[in-house]
């Protein structure tokens, strides 16, 4: 709707207005978060003293029950840690798929025959909504069963299969959305579970350092994702060819996950 309505308003293309208008809520929310979000749960005004005590007790219980994390709490433990590098590689794959799907999904939808910009925008929102719902369900299941690895491996496996199958249904809008929705579960739905992994074998400063390092490695995906997609499309001659690269990335991510401590 934005691209169609605001195209050439004040000399700007519709896609330029899209970036400008969609950026405003993010910027405002960032400023609001910086001002209102406390640094520690003990500073949260919306929590009662009893609730703060429960949170503190649960955090200490998690740390005491995690034998792998004991004694590994320094900056050095978090920075020079092979498992953290593995997490960085996994997160790199996750972001690579997330960025590429986010930027190129409209192209894949358009290739099925949908041409109206508003319709494309509404359709590409479906996988994101499903990924959001999956995020809540997968996170709840992971906490319920106190299990992390297989709550990541299984979505990655199904996501990889879905991306492989996209080539067979490149002109079918329904199957395209179904397959991309499965892929969205693997990218978006697994985020909370993934970011709970550093605390399973690190604690304190080491966990924070490891978290930051894994994110820094992963953010390199933003630099290479579009270039990689463009090169893959040029090489294969069709947009779906780029998805094979991401499917392979998820396969390697599964292997790396299975090598991490339980």
Residue ranges and their predicted role:
Residues 2-4, 29, 33, 106, ...:
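Small-residue (Gly/Pro/Ala) motifs that create kinks and tight helix-helix packing interfaces
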Residues 11-75, 259-262:
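Central mid-sequence intracellular linker of multi-pass
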């Amino acid at each position: 709707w934005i691209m169609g309505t605001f195209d050439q308003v004040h000399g700007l293309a519709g896609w330029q207005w899209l970036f400008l208008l969609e950026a405003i809520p993010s910027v405002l929310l960032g400023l609001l978060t910086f001002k209102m979000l406390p640094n520690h749960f003990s500073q949260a005004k919306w929590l009662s003293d009893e609730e703060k005590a429960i949170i503190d007790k649960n955090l200490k219980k998690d740390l005491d029950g995690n034998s792998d994390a004991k004694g590994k709490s320094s900056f050095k433990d978090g920075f020079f840690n092979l498992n953290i590098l593995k997490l960085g590689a996994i997160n790199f794959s996750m972001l690579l798929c997330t960025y590429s799907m986010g930027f190129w999904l409209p192209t894949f939808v358009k290739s099925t025959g949908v041409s109206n910009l508003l319709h494309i925008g509404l359709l590409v929102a479906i996988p994101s909504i499903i990924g959001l719902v999956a995020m809540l369900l997968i996170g709840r299941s992971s906490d319920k069963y106190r299990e992390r690895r297989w709550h990541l491996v299984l979505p990655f496996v199904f996501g990889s299969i879905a991306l492989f199958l996209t080539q067979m249904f490149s002109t079918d809008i329904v199957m395209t959305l179904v397959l991309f929705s499965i892929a969205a579960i693997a990218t978006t739905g697994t985020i909370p579970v993934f970011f709970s992994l550093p605390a399973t074998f690190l604690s304190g400063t080491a966990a924070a350092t490891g978290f930051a390092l894994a994110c820094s490695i992963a953010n390199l995906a933003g630099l290479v994702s579009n270039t990689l997609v463009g090169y893959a499309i040029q090489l294969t001659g069709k947009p779906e060819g780029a998805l094979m690269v991401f499917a392979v990335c998820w396969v390697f991510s599964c292997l790396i996950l299975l090598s991490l401590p339980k």
